[in-house]
Amino acid sequence: MKLSEQWLREWVNPPVDTEKLTAQLTMAGLEVDSVKPAARTLEKVVVGEVIAREKHPDADRLSVCRVDVGEDEPLEIVCGAPNVRTGLKVAVVLVGGVVGDLKVKKTKLRGVVSNGMICSEREMGLSEQHEGIMELPADAPIGKNIQEYLTLDDYILDIELTPNRGDCASVRGIAREVGAINRLPIKGPNLVTVSATINDVFPVEVKAEKACPRYIGRVIRGVDSHSQTPLWICERLRRSGLRTIHPVVDVMNYVMLELGQPLHAFDLSRLVEGIEVRFAKADEKITLIDETEIALTERMLVIADKSRPQALAGIMGGANSAVNEKTEAIFLESAYFSPGEIALTARHYDMQTDSSYRFERGVDFKLQTLAMERATELLIQITGGSPGPLIEVCSETHLPKIPRIILRPERIKRLLGIEINEDEVSKLLELLGMRVVKEKNNWVVTVPSHRFDIKEEADLIEELAHLYGYDRIPQLRMEGEYTIAPFSETQLSSARLRCLMTDRGYHEAVTYSFVNDELQTLLNPEVTSIALSNPLTAEMNVMRTSLWPGLIQVLKYNQARQTHRIRLFEIGMCFNAAGNEWQQVTKLGGLVAGDAHSLQWAEKGRRVDFYDVKGDLSALFTLTRTEAHFRFAEGHHPALHPGQSAALYYKDQCIGYLGALHPELVDQLELTAAPFLFEMELNAIKTSILPKYHPLSKFPSIRRDIAIVVDRDVPVGNIEEEIKSTAGQLLIITQVFDIYESGKHIEFGKKSVALGLTFQDPSRTLIDGEVKQIIERVLAALERKFNAKLRA
């Protein structure tokens, strides 16, 4: 944000120079990116009036001008600007004068002597405007030093605001900070309430109260659109990086820079029946004041009349109702819009205006009436006109709530390492406009409406620190007790899990904890998301409940760049709402897409399948040395393909899911192929058991193969569990080596499962009879539970 130092000092004028002032702002967290003079070096530059203009006798593009600069005789000056004309007030550099690095001398141009130079804004360092010479107001005093006339003994401060300090996007906001730092009150203009002189009102209906909790309007008739914007407003706009457009628009911009409240003016004659603040309808379009036509979606907030959208709320007005030189009646708008709604629209259309810049960061929700009165006052002074009464529509329930925060002295000492006198704490906070009440040993602080970045105790302590002065905080040796956390050999570290995943060809991803609500709901409509009150962007408006939204976004990013074989994993926190509480759960998730292996000459390529990913998870479970307690079972997740998914269980607890992304979601997300996803609670796989020594058996093992026929829908995992529980400790290995579902000798709806069972006793040699008895018990158990038949 750019602003004039002179303008700032009208609000608060601390006894410090420019260098000290910028240092104070930077230490307060408002980093001053640059400090530049308001103009280049100017010597012997005065106001002049062109009293005669003739065409140069030997050059079509040059003019010979006689210019009155307040001396005995007019000067003859050769000028090449297309806008030079008789009666124009201009900036003239006299012979011997200096503009920047240029010293002006008497010169002969195509045979005509030029006794000076008429300047453009660019030559004087005022702006990049160079199409013609600078045109001064008609009442500019001839012979007046231009530096004094334009008050150019000034500096332009360019302040880099962080997203949380939207309250400082105005001269008033910066003045509040400077005043607090220097213990000075701020002055500013005398803001008055303008009485209505006509009874004209224009109907306003707010249909989107959550997106626009407060809307104030006013009709002003009899506006003179040909009036001249005062030079002091023009200069302040220029030094803030804005150009003059129209007296009404200039006043809107000036009040925005002064107070921080964006305003908009509609040509009242172009509005039909009334104002509606609503979301756009399907297939609606709007042509903006920059002549850009955009197609609106139903998520976009607009200001409309009864016929069409007339403005993109909080961002830019429409061309249809823009004020122009024929405008005689206007409807002024001063509103509070939800930061998230404005951010959503601005990001969607890749637009950032001075208005959206402020609304996205947050505007004081109590400022709208004040800004309306200030704009009305200036408009009547400059353009004339008769104002009507204020029209206000407000939904108090949807306005931001002002927090009351308890501040504890012990917390101040813990965070800053010092004790601050109780009276000083109260005074410092009151300098920031806060209401402070002492209750017992604590302070109860009510935050002003413009400080929407202060939400908790730590925020107050941060404000105390920069007002108290970081240079007053002594350097102390850190003291404290550090207890070494006990290390358990049964705890698997996250680093070990990461190593295994990378060993199996995965790349670790780190995605944002903030995700898009629409994508998260698409993947799991049953989940309740935690909404952010002030999201960084409209696409990151809720806390994630799963790692999958972030991983899918990474997949889309890579597929758009022709990378199709992707193996990703992530370990991160997820946040689940549970009533009025919320829970943090650390999860391990992954995504696999594309070919199972990199292309090679010795093996034909194939797509990754369910069992590839299942094998990776089985390897992960093996790390715990309790892999027998993990199982893959039937389970439903709305994001996964019902025929290619499974629930992950540890003992009897569901810890996650694995499967292919649902085909409908693949289409909606415009993915090239369905990826496989998995996710589980990290704590379920972080506990291992200590290995115990078991000597290898000296005695031979016996393997018996069996093939049973069961119903097709019987899970093989259930069969394995039943075999293990029935066979006892002599069974050391169970291996499925064949599944046959169709063909000769197999009934429809049945399948054949072949298993290899290996038996061994560590203390003796088993005999066939013992193994035969175990096999018979196993077959009997399988028949009872699954109606399994031994295949002939």
UniProtKB/Swiss-Prot annotation:
Domain B5: 400-475
Subcellular location: Cytoplasm
UniProt keyword annotation of ATP-binding present: yes
InterPro entries per UniProt: aa-tRNA-synth_II/BPL/LPL (IPR045864), B3/B4_tRNA-bd (IPR005146), DNA-bd_dom_put_sf (IPR009061), Fdx_antiC-bd (IPR005121), Fdx_antiC-bd_sf (IPR036690), NA-bd_OB-fold (IPR012340), Phe-tRNA-ligase_IIc_bsu (IPR045060), Phe-tRNA-ligase_IIc_bsu_bact (IPR004532)
Domain FDX-ACB, first and last residues per copy: 697-791
Keywords: Aminoacyl-tRNA synthetase, ATP-binding, Cytoplasm, Ligase, Magnesium, Metal-binding, Nucleotide-binding, Protein biosynthesis, RNA-binding, tRNA-binding
Cofactor annotation comment: Binds 2 magnesium ions per tetramer.
E.C. designation(s): 6.1.1.20
Main location: cytoplasm
Keyword Protein biosynthesis appears in the UniProt entry: yes
Biological process annotations from GO: phenylalanyl-tRNA aminoacylation
Family under the similarity heading: Belongs to the phenylalanyl-tRNA synthetase beta subunit family. Type 1 subfamily.
Assembly: Tetramer of two alpha and two beta subunits.
Name of the protein: Phenylalanine--tRNA ligase beta subunit
Organism, scientific name: Coxiella burnetii (strain RSA 493 / Nine Mile phase I)
Lineage of origin: Bacteria, Pseudomonadati, Pseudomonadota, Gammaproteobacteria, Legionellales
